[in-house]
């Protein structure tokens, strides 16, 4: 009984330490953007597929970038390999990599470890891109996926999709996790307003106050 209690206390302390030591430095817009959407995703995750159209539409509506990190969960049997293929297509062009992720989400129920390669070949043919017999001979793209996953671990990601609206504002919290996706647009509105407001405050000259002598 005592050993079990000690184990529980140790686990709680470890979780608390992890929570306080999370690194959120990755939660920021790319250079040149004031506001962006950051998403940690798994290509085999049904909820990621459900969220994808909303995220794309929000990015288009507000003309803001989406920064995606591959976070393939160990319980899924083809998401890591699909993410590696995605990094290969990213190396050809970012829009092509984004289109591959869209393809995976749209065809998710029919994809399996056995037919992932044939799906990648079909996608490549549709987009007039060559798919080499060995996609990642040196493990470079697998390394990129692992690096994305490591970023997620440092942030403290526990599930997919995890979505943030991030900004470059100088004051207050520069990122907000979108827990309720129905509030995505209102969170973006608020973040854009706060970002523009903080910039205006920072640029507004401070008037000198003259104190009258008695």
Task: For every predicted segment, state its role.
Residues 1-5:
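Positively charged n-region of N-terminal signal peptides that target proteins for export
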Residues 6-17:
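Bacterial N-terminal signal peptides
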Residues 9, 20, 65-67:
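Domain-level signature for proteins that mediate thiol-based redox and metal-cofactor handling
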Residues 20-35:
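A short beta-strand-turn-helix
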Residues 29-31, 59-61, 78, 154-159:
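Extracellular/periplasmic catalytic domains that process cell-envelope and extracellular macromolecules
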Residues 36-38, 162-163:
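Catalytic His-Asp charge-relay segment
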Residues 38, 43, 49-125:
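Structural alpha/beta surface segment adjacent to cysteine/selenocysteine redox centers
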Residues 121-214:
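C-terminal cap of thioredoxin/glutaredoxin-like
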């Amino acid at each position: 009984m005592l050993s079990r209690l000690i184990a529980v206390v140790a686990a709680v302390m470890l979780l608390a330490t992890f929570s306080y030591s999370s690194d959120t430095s990755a939660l920021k817009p790319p250079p040149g953007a004031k506001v962006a959407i950051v998403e940690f995703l798994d290509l085999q995750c049904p909820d990621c597929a459900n969220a994808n159209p909303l995220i794309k539409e929000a990015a288009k509506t507000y003309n803001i970038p989406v920064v995606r990190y591959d976070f393939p969960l160990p319980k899924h049997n083809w998401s890591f390999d699909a993410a590696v293929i995605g990094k290969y297509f990213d190396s050809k062009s970012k829009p092509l990599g984004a289109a591959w992720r869209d393809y995976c989400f749209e065809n998710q129920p029919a994809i399996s470890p056995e037919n992932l390669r044939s799906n990648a070949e079909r996608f490549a043919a549709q987009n007039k891109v060559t798919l080499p017999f060995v996609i990642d001979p040196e493990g470079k793209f697998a390394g990129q996926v692992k690096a994305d996953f490591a970023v997620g671990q440092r942030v403290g990601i526990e599930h997919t999709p995890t979505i943030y609206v991030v900004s470059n504002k100088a004051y207050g919290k520069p990122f907000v996790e979108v827990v309720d996706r129905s509030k995505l647009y209102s969170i973006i509105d608020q973040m854009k307003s706060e970002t523009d407001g903080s910039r205006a405050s920072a640029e507004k000259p401070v008037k000198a106050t003259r104190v009258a002598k008695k």
